[in-house]
Amino acid sequence: MEARLAELESRLAFQEITIEELNLTVTAHEMEMAKLRDHLRLLTEKLKASQPSNIASQAEETPPPHY
């Protein structure tokens, strides 16, 4: 009985350590993903700003011939 209890306590301690390590990993990944989202947003904005659209606005469009 005593050996079983010691084994369970050992497993619990190992699981607690593993959970803490996984938590740290998940937190680090979340921070990295936030940085990557910010970089992607900035790059998207820069790309849109550097490449003007070839589609004219409705004000610039000439009306179709049937008008």
Swiss-Prot record:
Pfam families for this protein: SlyX (PF04102)
Region feature (Disordered): 47-67
InterPro entries recorded: SlyX
Start-end of Polar residues biased regions: 50-60
Gene3D superfamilies named in the record: 1.20.5.300
PANTHER family from the UniProt entry: PROTEIN SLYX
Family of this protein: Belongs to the SlyX family.
Protein name: Protein SlyX
